[in-house]
């Protein structure tokens, strides 16, 4: 009997152990195939397993390739069939992966490939070791076939909700910025997103941290392959990372010059906003050289009305009506390169700089009625001016990513530098009352190393992250408080280890992160020992998940640590008005949060439930400035709450009804904090209900309509009260030219003029109610043109991301 060996080739990187339940029938079939001496391919679920009989004298080979359209866009799920050119006998077959790639066993040198996909002309080609196949559109076939975009269904697996974007209704939403707002359990828009139960997420694009969310306004939603929402990030993420949204771009394989032009204009009742951007990418072989230039001009118009009570030596009431105009302009430049040495190794560098276009101005005016013991004491006319001066900021990232066998090494190094300079002047009844000048200089150096390797039946990740920050803050004022010269040096050194294991329908994860944080706080270059702490923290993470058929469930735990922002730590006193000052607290300690989260989905329904217990939570609060010398002045400052908790649940449903594809999210949350140590009375712990609905309509002739809205209910929670708020938006877009190269979108925001912000809270011996409206009702038009579309292959993920956010 001859000695034989069975070769298994799969189009995924998953190990066979993960699908152990299906290996036995595959082996049984392979025996019968061996008897016939014919290699074959078995489709096992979504994985194509090629089984090939190999004798000692047979040379085992395989062919690899990618299937693209005429614009170099990958075509996923195209059918690939290999057959004998002489007898037309079937040899093997598969479908392409999401990036258009495929792999098949190859032993017959005379074999041919037949490649087919709906809407494209079928091609028959001779087999080669490496193939790049371009399918041409079949115009006649497209005229008789209607291709429908379906509503993507989120699937929870391995700790993340994964939603396919490419080819779904989400790809029609214009920009990645618009698309993110419609992901499950995401609320907010324009960079101000929150994950229900977790808070503000970090955004990653192809593994690279997105520092400026305006970048997502320049990225088309059609260029996104899929989005993953990680509600409880693992140990390799910084201790302050609340949640993560990972975006993966469609990999486009075109060569030569490509680019896109983007323009946006919107007009409110008072405020215009405009931005223009141009992006270019030149690709030759494995080298990408890219660059971008962008400019933006914004004018905001805000009206607010506040009522404040302060109870000290007397009862003081302040009734303030104020209007603020803010004019800003900004320019952005970036350039860089990425070089793929091979499919296994790449490196690159990116430089980015931005600056204000001239001075940016803010002008505020209004009046305040001051009552003392219900008697009018003063009617004050207030006018203030502030100015920010232009300074270039500089950011550099360099990275290396390489695979060595089954090991992966990813290294990032970052440098960041910026200067902020501003001035303020305030007039009361036309007389100059206060002036101040502020200058801040920031420097950051950071590195991060992540090594990933297989271990037993799972995957192990370990690495280090280092961050070194230097910040100087100079504050000079005209006499209402004291000058300040603060200098902060901080270093954070971290190491982490994480392991993920899949066994049958179960998956397990565990990780541990260690952080050593040292802070040196100087006032006038004199070290302040009490304000220069050293912290050593262990940050654990654990998760467990179950997947079977349409049901996916996971439970996770993580400890988060949040260091106060540098603004929170400032000791200088800012002049807000004649009767209100503001300052930070350099004695703030890091906030620690224990998070427990249950996630899951069944078919098109997803759900989350969460509980968070927080130690030393940061809180903005109001108290008397100085009862003895200034009993009528209110101070806005920072405090920590020793113990607090918030918890709740949410459900998301995304069915599909023909051209109408709705998406509904309903949530409830509770918040409790004991504020007795601050002498702040609480109002209650009522449930806060929120509802959000997106209605998407995919119409003929490349038209698309979106109508979305949200509303939250009244609720008294802890020391504050939430008032019922809501918003409605409308979008309509149409694609033009071949391959939808031109997209025009009309946007109507805050249709019902309900986008108000309300604030109602108790303070120490004080209470404040605020109503604010920022000219949100507006009409806008977005135009995007793309040519020879390719995406940069830059894979730098950045280091020191948490410190960049603090700066």
List each language-model region with its residue ranges.
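Short, acidic, small-residue-rich periplasmic hinge/interaction motif at the N-terminus
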Residues: 37-56, 68, 81-83, 114-120, ...
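Short, acidic Ser/Thr/Gly-rich low-complexity loop/linker segments typical of extracellular
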Residues: 86-101
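Short acidic/polar hinge/loop motifs at secondary-structure boundaries
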Residues: 103-105, 182, 208-234
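N-terminal periplasmic accessory domains that precede
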Residues: 129-136, 144, 176-179, 214, ...
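Surface-exposed extracellular loop regions of Gram-negative outer-membrane beta-barrel proteins
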Residues: 248-263, 303, 307, 319, ...
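Face-selective signature of the C-terminal outer-membrane beta-barrel domain
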Residues: 332-358, 380-524, 545-552, 606-609, ...
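Outer membrane beta-barrel strand-and-loop segments of large Gram-negative receptors
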Residues: 444-448, 492-494, 583, 589, ...
């Amino acid at each position: 009997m001859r000695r034989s060996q069975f070769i298994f080739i799969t189009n995924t990187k998953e190990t066979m152990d993960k699908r152990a339940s299906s290996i036995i029938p595959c082996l049984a079939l392979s025996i019968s195939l061996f008897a016939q001496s014919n290699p074959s391919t078995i489709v096992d679920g979504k994985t194509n397993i090629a089984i090939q009989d190999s004798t000692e004298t047979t040379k085992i080979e395989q062919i690899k390739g990618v299937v693209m359209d005429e614009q170099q866009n990958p075509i996923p799920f195209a059918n690939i069939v290999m057959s004998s050119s002489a007898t037309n006998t079937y040899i093997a077959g598969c479908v392409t992966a999401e990036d258009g790639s495929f792999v098949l066993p190859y032993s017959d040198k005379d074999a041919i490939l037949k490649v087919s996909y709906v809407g494209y002309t079928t091609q028959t080609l001779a087999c080669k070791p490496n193939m790049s196949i371009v399918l041409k559109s079949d115009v006649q076939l497209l005229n008789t076939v209607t291709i429908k975009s379906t509503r993507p269904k989120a699937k929870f697996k391995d700790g993340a909700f994964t939603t396919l974007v490419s080819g779904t209704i989400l790809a029609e939403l214009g920009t990645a910025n618009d698309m993110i707002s419609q992901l499950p359990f995401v609320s907010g828009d324009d960079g101000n997103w929150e994950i229900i139960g977790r808070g503000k997420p970090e955004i990653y694009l192809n593994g690279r941290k997105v520092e400026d969310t305006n970048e997502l306004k320049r990225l088309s939603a059609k260029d996104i392959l899929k989005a993953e929402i990680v509600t409880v990030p693992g140990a390799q993420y910084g201790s302050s990372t609340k949640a993560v949204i990972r975006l993966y771009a469609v990999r486009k394989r075109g060569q030569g010059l490509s680019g896109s032009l983007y323009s946006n204009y919107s007009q409110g009742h008072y405020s215009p906003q405009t931005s223009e951007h141009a992006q270019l990418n030149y690709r030759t072989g494995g080298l990408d050289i890219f660059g971008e230039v962008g400019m933006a001009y914004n004018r905001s118009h805000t009206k607010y009305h506040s009522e404040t009570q302060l109870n000290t030596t007397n009862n003081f009431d302040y009734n303030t009506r104020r209007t603020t105009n803010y004019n800003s302009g900004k320019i952005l430049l970036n350039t860089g390169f990425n070089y793929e040495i091979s499919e296994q190794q790449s490196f690159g560098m990116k430089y980015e700089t931005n600056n204000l276009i001239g001075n940016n101005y803010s002008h505020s005016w209004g009046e305040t009625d001051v009552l003392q013991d219900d008697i009018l004491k003063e009617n004050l006319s207030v006018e203030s001016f502030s100015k920010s001066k232009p300074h270039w900021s500089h950011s550099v990232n360099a990275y290396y990513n390489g695979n060595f066998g089954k090991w992966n090494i990813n290294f990032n190094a970052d440098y960041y530098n910026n200067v902020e300079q501003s001035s303020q002047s305030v007039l009361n009844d036309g007389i100059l009352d206060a002036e101040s000048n502020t200058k801040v200089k920031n420097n950051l150096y950071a590195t991060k190393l992540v090594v990933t390797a297989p271990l037993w039946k799972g995957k192990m990740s370990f690495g280090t992250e280092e961050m070194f920050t230097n910040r100087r803050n100079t504050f000079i004022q005209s006499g209402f408080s004291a000058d300040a010269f603060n200098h902060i040096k901080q270093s954070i050194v971290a190491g982490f280890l994480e392991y993920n294991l899949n066994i049958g329908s179960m998956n397990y994860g565990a990780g541990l992160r260690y952080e050593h944080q040292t802070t040196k706080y100087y006032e006038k270059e004199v070290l302040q020992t009490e304000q220069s702490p050293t912290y050593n923290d262990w940050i654990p993470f654990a998760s467990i998940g179950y997947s079977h058929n349409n049901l996916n469930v996971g439970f996770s735990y993580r400890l988060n640590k949040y260091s106060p922002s540098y603004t929170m730590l400032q000791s200088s006193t800012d002049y807000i008005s004649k009767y209100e000052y503001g300052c930070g607290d350099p004695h703030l300690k890091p906030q620690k949060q224990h998070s427990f989260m249950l996630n899951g989905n069944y078919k098109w329904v997803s759900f989350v439930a969460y509980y968070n217990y927080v130690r030393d939570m940061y809180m903005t609060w109001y108290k008397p400035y100085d009862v003895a010398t200034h009993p009528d002045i209110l101070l806005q400052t920072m405090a920590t709450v020793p113990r607090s908790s918030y918890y709740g649940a949410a459900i998301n449903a995304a069915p599909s009804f023909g051209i109408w594809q709705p998406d509904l999210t309903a949530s409830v949350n509770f918040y409790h904090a004991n504020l007795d140590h601050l002498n702040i009375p609480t109002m209650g712990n009522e449930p806060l209900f929120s509802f959000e609905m997106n209605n998407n309509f995919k119409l003929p002739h490349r038209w698309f309509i979106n109508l979305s809205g949200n509303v939250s209910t009244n609720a008294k929670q802890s020391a504050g009260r939430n008032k019922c708020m809501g918003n409605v938006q409308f979008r309509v877009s149409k694609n033009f030219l071949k391959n939808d190269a031109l997209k025009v979108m009309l946007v109507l925001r805050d249709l019902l003029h309900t986008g108000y912000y309300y604030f109602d809270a108790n303070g120490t011996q004080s209470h404040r109610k605020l109503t604010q409206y920022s000219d949100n009702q507006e009409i806008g038009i977005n135009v995007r043109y793309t040519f020879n579309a390719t995406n940069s292959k830059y894979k730098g993920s950045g280091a020191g991301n948490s410190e960049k956010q603090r700066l």
